[in-house]
């Protein structure tokens, strides 16, 4: 039974909305075309070859000064010249050797040929399209005096008129006696044809007649022609030959019912034709049409969408709901009119129009038959006229740019009405046929995105459709998302979402495929209640794109993003736990991998770059080319720019043996060139290196090398530098010293030898942050070798410690306590630790380091002698030139010339400098010769905290002889103790001077007091030294000066001293340095001991504030001079 009429009272009739004039769209399209043609219009007339040549010459001469370039061309303005440059900017940006005037001429010739060729072809193809636009407007046709059959009872608002000036195809279709079969659409059987359409006339409402008489534009004629075609189609919407009801079209309704039915037919036809596949734009003309007819429909596409389509949607959304049987007849007629094929009974009568969901609760209407088949279909005599009108309308829609809003809304309106009408008619449809139909529906949906029918409230084409679609996908339940990812269905056309158990069944949602966009949630929620009013409690409408869910589902979707967000927060806030088992397993796997020879070999090929080869492999020619052209800063290039770049770079080489051979030859030439630069730098012929060359390795630099025999990677130090090889001392004593090629030596810190051009692209601070341990070890290694003996501290002790040497925890604690209580006592502990660490080294390490120092001293002397030999050779050549000039009779012409004198003086000055270098190298070599005779650190003081038995430090006596005299530790400690006492006495004298008023008398007394105290300290120190000479391995824990010394030291930090503001610690260290220098000059000590004492004195003067570093540098220079002078007096 049909639903009760009480439901219809809910909706009020509203007048049909007025058609919106399409002038705005035409204006926007014209503006868009104007913007597109702007650059070509700015070019002006076609450029000749001479003008292009002059433009290119002027551009290369004046650059981007367009006024000057235009003046150089003479016949062009600055705007035209700039437009030409903008069009060929990518090509003109190339360097002058790559780009040429020939290429510019060729590019412009191609541009004009494509421009003219494209316009000619368009003119030929669209010849029939341009004719109606330029034709004058024809006179309006007044209302017809001959009403057609069946239209007598219509009211005025349902009458239509047409124009004979804009759409001649509609008029022609109704004046021809028989349809003309064209091309492949020749029917296989004879087609019956009716002559009723010749007598059919058009009607026009009085309101529109009055407006047209005043003179409206041609766009209204387009609208009325479409309305007329649809009205005729609705009047003759009888069934096809399949239904065998040819007389159904003669069935008449009352005027009011007939008007409602006609409007519904118009809306249905517009919706179906707007949903036609866009791929059929270029299809052949429909049955009964010619090429000329199809060419006449160029301009009316926007008119349709703004005319009848939008008004139909607005009317449909607010209109009434029709009975099930009547709408069913209408749907059947309209569908068969559009398709007209024999395929309808193959799928079953109910299945070809509707689809049922899997549980049989939700049904949907689907347009099943494609247009490709409909174009080849055959029609009966009763329906061919209506099909002609619909085909004409279809041809018009295919030529129009489909407006998304109107098309979507029209389709949505039709689907909503169809679904409401048929919701209870096909309740028991066969599930098997439904699954078959569903599969067909899914395949069509993927192929034809615009054929889907959807809810008008849910489908709105907007710029933010993609964003809304992403939001809707995020709002899916987590379980659904996991299932989609798990089953790899992200690219499928539907996602099944479970709903609440309120009789709504399953719901299908597309995954953003095709031209449909996601629905807006506001309209989704606003219209959901309205859609439920038109459905029964057991059956619900499920649209193709997205259905209106129940209130429970809406609440669930609203709350879902919050749940997902909270779960994500919990995951991110979970603390990171380090599993020791996984770390150990990873270390084990890594060690197992490194144990493989192939893995190590692969690491060498991947990351090992020698200092000389690194700039070659780090060079990127393509990046250099982009920088040269000026496109290096552009993150993304256009297609035209890529084309110009590819054409300028040429065809890429094939990776072949010949290619590798040529690249190797280039690499060998590069290496020879770099070595030549290095040799010139070493000989003094070159002041510096180019910016793109790596700096050579220096002597004593830490490197990573490939061992020439084992071909494994090992660490080592550079001992000597040769032309193409280095003498490397490996850290492993078993490997010894080997000559290694310069292509197999890599610096431990690549930044030290990196070229200046590449170093600028590196963040030096980031490297230090990422490699703090490596950098610290490298700095220690650089300082470990100084004048042939290693400098050690307590921080590097663990690197050189041996199993037979241990430091007790109590001693470490003692060091902390002493450093916290008295900073001055910390120096003695540090020195004791350093000395003990050195004495506890294995003898092999000392021998290796001694050999390294010997080789270094010898290499420095050899290099100095080579330089001196070159200078002497040059000096000899100059002398020979003077002698030859005198023999030739020039007398002293050459000798008296100013240039010769300057050159000769420069050579002599260079010779004097080289002589100094040779003398220093000889001195270093002599020091190494005496170093082997004496072993430093033969004795050491023991310093411990009283009362702790473990606070003692043992050592092994290294067979020191009595002839060595004072040891380094004795000199350092005695000097520091004496300096502290002197400062303490001086501070006491200053206090006395501040208290008394008679400063002259007190000054003399203070000086006498200080001298007396110093003399007493000297006598005490001599007695202490005598008692220390007979002691064995264990020594007292405190030095022999009086026990009041620590107390005296503690007095230095009293408030009185703070009031005086005397830097007693710094003063005591400076005085200790002077005392050390004095003691080193009194007797001839071994050079190693002298150097060590002076270095310890300089190290003690290192400032805490960075502002004092320049002063400290000057002190170091002065101490170096003093050391050289002292060592020069030492006999070899």
Curated annotation (Swiss-Prot):
Domain of life: Eukaryota
Stretches with biased composition (Basic residues): 1-17
Bias (Basic and acidic residues): 522-535
Residue stretches of biased makeup (Low complexity): 433-442
SUPFAM superfamilies, sorted: Homeodomain-like
Keywords: Nucleus
InterPro entries assigned: DIRP, Homeodomain-like_sf, LIN-9/ALY1, SANT/Myb
SANT domain span: 42-93
Known tissue expression: Expressed ubiquitously in vegetative and reproductive tissues.
A GO cellular component annotation in the UniProt record: DRM complex
N-terminal signal peptide: none
Main location: nucleus
Region (Disordered): 1-43, 115-157, 234-257, 283-320, 333-357, 422-476, 500-554, 941-963, 1018-1059
Location of this chain's protein in the cell: Nucleus
GO BP terms in the entry: DNA-templated transcription
Biased composition (Polar residues): 236-245, 1018-1035, 1047-1059
SUBUNIT field: Interacts with SNL1.
Name of this protein: Protein ALWAYS EARLY 3
Gene: ALY3
């Amino acid at each position: 039974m049909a639903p009760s009429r009480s439901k219809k009272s809910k909706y009020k009739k509203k007048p049909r909305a007025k058609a919106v004039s399409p002038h705005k769209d035409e204006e926007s399209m014209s503006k868009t075309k104007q913007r597109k043609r702007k650059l070509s219009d700015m070019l002006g007339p076609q450029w000749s070859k001479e003008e292009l040549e002059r433009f290119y010459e002027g551009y290369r001469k004046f650059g981007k000064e367009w006024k000057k370039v235009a003046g150089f061309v003479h016949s062009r303005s600055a705007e035209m010249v700039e437009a030409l440059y903008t069009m060929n900017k990518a090509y003109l940006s190339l360097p002058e050797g790559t780009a040429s005037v020939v290429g510019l001429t060729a590019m412009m010739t191609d541009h004009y040929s494509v421009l003219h060729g494209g316009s000619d072809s368009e003119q030929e193809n669209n010849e029939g399209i341009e004719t109606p636009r330029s034709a004058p407007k024809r006179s309006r046709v007044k209302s017809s005096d001959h009403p057609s059959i069946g239209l007598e009872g219509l009211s005025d608002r349902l009458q239509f008129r047409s124009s004979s000036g804009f759409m001649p195809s509609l008029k022609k279709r109704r004046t021809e006696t028989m349809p003309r079969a064209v091309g492949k659409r020749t029917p296989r059987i004879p087609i019956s044809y009716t002559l009723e359409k010749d007598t059919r006339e058009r009607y026009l409402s009085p309101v529109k007649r009055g407006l047209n008489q005043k003179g409206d534009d041609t766009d209204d004629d387009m609208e009325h022609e479409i309305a007329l075609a649809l009205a005729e189609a609705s009047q003759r919407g009888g069934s096809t030959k399949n239904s065998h009801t040819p007389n159904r079209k003669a069935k008449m309704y009352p005027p009011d019912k007939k008007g409602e039915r006609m409007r519904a037919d118009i809306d249905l036809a517009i919706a179906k034709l707007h949903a036609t596949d866009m791929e059929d734009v270029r299809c052949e003309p429909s049955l009964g049409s010619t090429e000329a007819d199809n060419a006449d429909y160029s301009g009316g596409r926007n008119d349709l969408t703004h005319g009848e389509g939008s008004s139909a949607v607005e009317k449909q959304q607010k209109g009434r709901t029709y009975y099930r049987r009547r709408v069913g007849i209408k749907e059947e007629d309209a569908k068969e009119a559009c398709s007209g094929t024999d395929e309808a009974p193959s799928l079953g009568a109910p299945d070809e129009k509707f689809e049922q969901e899997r549980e049989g609760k939700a049904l949907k209407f689907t347009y099943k038959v494609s247009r490709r088949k409909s174009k080849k279909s055959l029609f009966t005599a009763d329906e061919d006229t209506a099909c002609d009108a619909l085909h004409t309308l279809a041809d018009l829609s295919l030529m129009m740019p489909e407006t998304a809003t109107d098309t979507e809304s029209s389709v949505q309106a039709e689907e909503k009405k169809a679904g409401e009408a048929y919701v209870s008619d096909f309740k028991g449809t066969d599930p098997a046929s439904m699954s078959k139909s569903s599969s067909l529906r899914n395949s069509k949906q993927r192929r034809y995105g615009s054929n889907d029918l959807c809810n008008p409230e849910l489908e709105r084409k907007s710029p933010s459709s993609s964003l809304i679609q992403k939001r809707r996908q995020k709002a899916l339940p987590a379980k659904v998302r996991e299932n989609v990812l798990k089953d790899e269905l992200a690219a499928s056309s539907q996602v099944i979402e479970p709903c609440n158990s309120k009789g709504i069944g399953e719901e299908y949602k597309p995954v953003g495929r095709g031209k449909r966009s996601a629905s807006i949630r506001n309209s989704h929620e606003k219209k959901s209640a309205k859609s439920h009013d038109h459905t029964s409690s057991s059956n619900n409408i499920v649209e193709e794109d997205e259905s209106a869910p129940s209130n429970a589902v809406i609440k669930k979707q609203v709350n879902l993003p919050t749940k997902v967000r909270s779960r994500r927060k919990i995951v991110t806030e979970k603390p990171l736990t380090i599993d020791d088992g996984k770390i150990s397993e990873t270390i084990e796997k890594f060690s197992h991998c490194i144990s493989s020879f192939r893995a190590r070999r692969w690491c060498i090929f991947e990351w090992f770059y020698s200092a000389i080869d690194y700039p070659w492999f780090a060079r990127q020619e393509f990046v250099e080319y982009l920088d040269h052209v000026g496109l290096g800063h552009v993150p993304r290039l256009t297609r035209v720019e890529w084309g110009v770049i590819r054409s300028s770079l040429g065809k890429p080489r094939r990776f072949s043996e010949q290619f590798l051979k040529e690249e190797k030859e280039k690499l060998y030439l590069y290496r020879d060139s770099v070595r030549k630069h290095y040799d010139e730098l070493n000989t003094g012929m070159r002041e510096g290196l180019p910016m793109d060359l790596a700096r050579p390795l220096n002597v004593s630099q830490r490197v990573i090398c490939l061992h020439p025999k084992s071909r494994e990677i090992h660490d080592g130090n550079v001992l000597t530098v040769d032309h193409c090889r280095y003498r490397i001392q490996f850290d492993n004593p078993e490997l010894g010293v080997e000559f290694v090629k310069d292509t197999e030596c890599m610096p431990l810190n690549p930044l030290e030898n990196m070229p200046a051009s590449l170093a600028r692209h590196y963040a030096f601070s980031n490297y230090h942050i990422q490699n703090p341990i490596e950098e610290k070890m490298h700095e220690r290694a650089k300082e470990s070798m100084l004048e042939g003996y290693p400098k050690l501290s307590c921080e590097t002790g663990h690197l050189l410690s041996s199993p037979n040497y241990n430091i007790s925890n109590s001693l470490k604690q003692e060091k902390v306590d002493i450093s916290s209580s008295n900073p001055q006592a910390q120096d003695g502990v540090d020195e004791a630790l350093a000395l003990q660490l050195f004495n506890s080294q294995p003898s092999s390490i000392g021998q290796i380091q001694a050999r390294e120092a010997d080789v270094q001293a010898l290499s420095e002397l050899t290099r100095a002698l080579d330089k001196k030999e070159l200078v002497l050779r040059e000096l000899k050549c100059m002398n020979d030139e003077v002698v030859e000039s005198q023999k030739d009779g020039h007398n002293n012409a050459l000798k008296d010339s100013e240039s010769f004198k300057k050159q000769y003086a420069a050579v002599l000055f260079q010779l004097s400098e080289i002589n100094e270098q040779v003398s220093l190298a000889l001195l270093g070599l002599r020091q190494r010769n005496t170093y082997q005779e004496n072993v430093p650190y033969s004795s050491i003081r023991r310093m411990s905290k009283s009362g702790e038995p473990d606070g003692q430090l043992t050592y092994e006596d290294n067979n020191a002889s009595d002839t060595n005299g004072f040891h380094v530790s004795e000199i350092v400690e005695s000097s520091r103790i004496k300096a502290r006492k002197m400062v303490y006495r001086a501070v006491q004298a200053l206090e006395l001077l501040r208290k008394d008023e008679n400063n002259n008398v007190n000054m003399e007394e203070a000086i006498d007091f200080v001298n007396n105290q110093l003399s007493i300290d000297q006598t005490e120190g001599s007695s202490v030294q005598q008692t220390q000479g007979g002691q064995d391995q264990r020594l007292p824990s405190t030095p022999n000066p009086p026990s009041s010394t620590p107390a005296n030291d503690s007095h230095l930090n009293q408030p009185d001293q703070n009031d005086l503001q005397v830097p007693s610690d710094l003063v005591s260290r400076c005085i200790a340095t002077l005392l050390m220098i004095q003691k080193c000059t009194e007797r001839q000590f071994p050079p190693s001991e002298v150097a060590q004492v002076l270095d310890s004195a300089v190290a003690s003067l290192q400032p805490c504030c960075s502002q004092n570093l320049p002063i400290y540098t000057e002190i170091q220079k002065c101490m170096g001079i003093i050391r050289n002078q002292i060592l020069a007096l030492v006999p070899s």
